[in-house]
Amino acid sequence: MIEALKEIAKQNPQGFTVDLNLNPVTSGYVIAVPETQNCFGDQGLEKVLEIARDNGYCIGGWLNRENGRFYWDASLIVRDLEEAKEIGRKFNQIAIFDLDEQREIWL
């Protein structure tokens, strides 16, 4: 699965979110979970995959344009905006991502 996720990241360098079956998640609000904050490289991907599997989270990745690093996240998908904002704040996130509109929502 690690190699498949790397290939998805290679094909989607600006970012992606997939479920544990590697199907694209295209709707809802993405909230990165704190346990996988600042995960990058192979070691970071392994940690993200383990946490996602253990908790039923989705897996995502995105390119930080400021430092050129590709970050991996285990993510929770929520359908309700207010609930997503509340969880995002609880997780100390500065933003969540709206998959439907393809935009960040700053908290």
Region spans (language model):
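Conserved, structured core segments of small domains
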Residues: 1-107
